[in-house]
C-alpha cells in the first residue's frame, strides 16, 4: 500500500478534520473536499493493487447523495446510486449519471463495474452487510471495491448529535439533540443511524475471502496500526476503510 500510505499524511488528516464542522450548514464545502479525497484514495489504491488508472472506467458510487462525488469522477463513466428522491432533486440530479435504488438490492447485472465504492453509508442502513455483498456482486472480477464507514464508538459516531453524547447511548443523544435544537437530528438513531463496530466490519470483510486492506481513513499512515488492536480500534478508528477485490 505504498501509494495509499504516501497520501495519508498528517496534513491531510488535519485538513479533513477542519472540514467536518461544515457538514450540516455548508455541505458543499464538506462533501466536495471529501469527494476529492475519495478520488485520490481510489487512484492510490488502484495503483497499489496494480490495477489500470480508473479514467474512462466504470465507477459505481453507492449512496452518491447530492452529486458532489460526480464532480470528482467526471473523467470516468460514473453512476451514482441514491435511494432518496430529496437528495437527488436537491442537486438537480436526473437521467444520465444518477440512479434511484437500494444499496441492498443494486439494480445492476453481475460484474458490471470496474470500481464500486461507498463512503459513509453503511452506518445509515440496518442491513449494511447485504449492501457489501451487493457491491461485490456488481464489481467485475478483480475489480476494486471500497467500503468506508463511521465507527459507532469513534468520536464522530453520533454525527451531529455531538462528540460524547452517543457514548451514553444512541437514544439519549437523539433526544438530547431534539431538546437543545427544537427538532430531530437528520441522523436519527435506530432509523437513519445505526451502531456499526470496527470488529463487525473486519469480520465481515475477512469472511468474504476478498479483503485486500483495512485501515483508518482519516489517520496518517503512521497511526494505521490502531486498526489491528481490538477494543482500542473501536474508539480510535473514527472511519474504517475496507478494500476488497471483485
Per-region residue spans from a language model:
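Conserved N-terminal segment of class I S-adenosyl-L-methionine
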Residues: 1-105, 117, 132, 194, ...
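Gly/Ser/Thr-rich beta-alpha loop segments that engage phosphate groups in nucleotides
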Residues: 65-69, 138, 159
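Alpha-helical architecture
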Residues: 100, 121-122, 149
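Active-site micro-motifs of SAM-dependent methyltransferase domains
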Residues: 105, 123, 154
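A short SAM/SAH-binding and catalytic strip from SAM-dependent methyltransferases
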Residues: 115-126
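S-adenosyl-L-methionine-dependent methyltransferase catalytic module, highlighting the catalytic core
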Residues: 126-134, 140, 144-245
Amino acid at each position: 500500500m505504498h501509494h495509499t500510505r504516501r497520501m495519508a499524511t498528517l496534513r491531510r488528516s488535519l485538513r479533513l478534520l477542519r472540514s467536518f464542522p461544515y457538514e450540516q450548514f455548508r455541505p458543499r464545502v464538506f462533501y466536495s473536499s471529501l469527494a476529492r479525497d475519495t478520488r485520490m484514495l481510489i487512484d492510490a489504491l488502484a495503483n497499489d493493487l496494480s490495477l489500470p488508472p480508473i479514467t474512462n472506467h466504470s465507477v459505481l458510487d453507492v449512496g452518491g447523495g447530492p452529486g458532489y462525488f460526480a464532480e470528482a469522477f467526471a473523467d470516468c463513466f460514473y453512476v451514482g446510486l441514491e435511494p432518496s428522491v430529496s437528495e437527488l432533486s436537491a442537486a438537480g440530479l436526473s437521467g444520465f449519471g444518477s440512479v434511484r435504488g437500494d444499496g441492498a438490492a443494486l439494480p445492476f447485472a453481475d460484474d458490471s463495474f470496474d470500481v464500486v465504492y461507498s463512503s459513509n453509508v453503511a452506518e445509515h442502513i440496518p442491513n449494511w452487510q447485504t449492501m457489501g455483498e451487493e457491491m461485490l456482486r456488481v464489481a467485475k472480477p478483480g475489480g476494486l471495491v471500497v467500503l468506508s464507514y463511521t465507527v459507532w464508538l469513534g468520536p464522530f459516531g453520533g454525527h451531529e448529535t455531538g462528540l460524547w453524547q452517543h457514548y451514553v447511548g444512541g437514544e439519549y443523544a437523539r433526544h438530547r439533540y431534539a431538546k437543545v435544537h427544537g427538532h430531530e437530528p437528520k441522523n436519527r438513531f435506530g432509523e437513519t443511524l445505526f451502531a456499526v463496530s470496527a470488529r463487525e466490519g473486519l469480520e465481515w470483510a475477512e469472511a468474504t475471502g476478498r479483503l485486500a486492506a483495512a485501515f483508518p481513513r482519516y489517520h496518517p499512515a503512521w497511526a494505521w496500526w490502531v486498526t489491528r488492536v481490538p477494543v482500542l480500534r473501536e474508539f480510535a478508528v473514527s472511519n474504517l476503510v475496507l478494500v476488497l477485490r471483485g
